[in-house]
Amino acid sequence: MKFALVLLGVCAFYLVNATGDLETELEASELQELQEALDLIGETPLESLEAEELEEARKFKWGKLFSTAKKLYKKGKKLSKNKNFKKALKFGKQLAKNLQAGEEHEPGTPVGNNKCWAIGTTCSDDCDCCPEHHCHCPAGKWLPGLFRCTCQVTESDKVNKCPPAE
């Protein structure tokens, strides 16, 4: 609550200062209202704000929040005992770990830093992938955040354009 009032005060102060050149366009009553709002914020004692926050916390229905959390916990515990769910979770964790870390394997010839990444691993260019693979970007250069580039098997129309390591 304090933060919101301070932020409102800073914004109002900024607006008042920023509109100094535009006073002719704004009506005097609007500027007066902004100034009164700033004065009101400055006059409000912090103790009353803390009391308001405490009152809001007392009115909040904590029991409902705790019962909802307890229900979610019980559902999660029940799901964790399901064998199919355990298998799917284990597979998902392993897949995420492999995609994130990038599995290394022995390259046919040295490329870039003498390491190359497994198929499906995120890459930035062909030098990240093995010589027999290439870096494929489905979204091109315009949206790499949504569709990541990955190392793929080199086909007849695609080639690894990374120069051989010296």
Swiss-Prot record:
Q: Which domain of life is it from?
A: Eukaryota
Q: Describe the location of the Oxytoxin-type inhibitor cystine knot (ICK) domain by residue ranges.
A: 113-166
Propeptide span(s): 19-58
Please list the GO biological process terms of this entry: defense response to bacterium; killing of cells of another organism
Signal peptide stretch:
1-18
Q: What is its main location?
A: secreted
Tissue expression per record: Expressed by the venom gland.
User: Could you tell me which cysteines form disulfide bridges?
Assistant: 116-130, 123-135, 127-162, 129-151, 137-149
- Annotated region (Linear cationic cytotoxin domain) at 59-99
Q: Which family does it belong to?
A: Belongs to the spiderine family. Cationic/spiderine subfamily.
**Domain comment, as recorded:** The presence of a 'disulfide through disulfide knot' structurally defines this protein as a knottin.
Q: Where in the cell is it found?
A: Secreted
Q: Name one GO molecular function term.
A: toxin activity
The protein's role, per its UniProt record = Has antimicrobial, insecticidal, cytolytic and cytotoxic activity. Active against E.coli DH5alpha, E.faecalis VKM B 871, B.subtilis VKM B 501, A.globiformis VKM Ac 1112, P.aeruginosa PAO1 and S.aureus 209P in submicromolar or low micromolar ranges. Lyses human erythrocytes. Kills HeLA and A549 cells.
Any one cellular-component term (Gene Ontology): extracellular region
Among InterPro entries, the record links this protein to:
OXYTX_ICK
Q: Which UniProt keywords apply?
A: Antibiotic, Antimicrobial, Cytolysis, Disulfide bond, Knottin, Secreted, Signal, Toxin
Give the protein's recorded name.
Spiderine-1a
